[in-house]
Amino acid sequence: MPRSLKKGPFVDDHLQAKVDVQNEKGTKQVIKTWSRRSTITPDFIGHTFAVHDGRKHVPVFVSENMVGHKLGEFAPTRTFKSHVKEDRKSKRR
């Protein structure tokens, strides 16, 4: 069930404060965050966030198409190691 419209989107206060400070100064530095649950709002457009994926921080540049999604959607937490095809040389005897 989606979030109620009367509540508005969830954004961690410390993250919103960092974006507001950068918008006032006119700077575009990378913002390091662990807040994967925060919703991307229109004032995030043009900023780069380093979103934590459990191991490292993945850079995410926010564009207009991302508004309404969560930051964590753009930093995958699982790495897929492809299924290794059998090595023909080791099978030969």
Swiss-Prot record:
PROSITE patterns: RIBOSOMAL_S19 (PS00323). Keywords: Ribonucleoprotein, Ribosomal protein, RNA-binding, rRNA-binding. The keyword Isomerase does not apply. It comes from the Bacteria. InterPro entries: Ribosomal_uS19, Ribosomal_uS19_bac-type, Ribosomal_uS19_CS, Ribosomal_uS19_SF. One of its GO terms (biological process) is translation. One of its GO terms (cellular component) is small ribosomal subunit. SUPFAM superfamilies: Ribosomal protein S19. One of its GO terms (molecular function) is structural constituent of ribosome. Pfam families: Ribosomal_S19. Belongs to the universal ribosomal protein uS19 family. PANTHER family: RIBOSOMAL PROTEIN S19P FAMILY MEMBER, SMALL RIBOSOMAL SUBUNIT PROTEIN US19M. Protein S19 forms a complex with S13 that binds strongly to the 16S ribosomal RNA. This is Small ribosomal subunit protein uS19. It comes from Nocardia farcinica (strain IFM 10152). The lineage of its organism: Bacteria, Bacillati, Actinomycetota, Actinomycetes, Mycobacteriales.
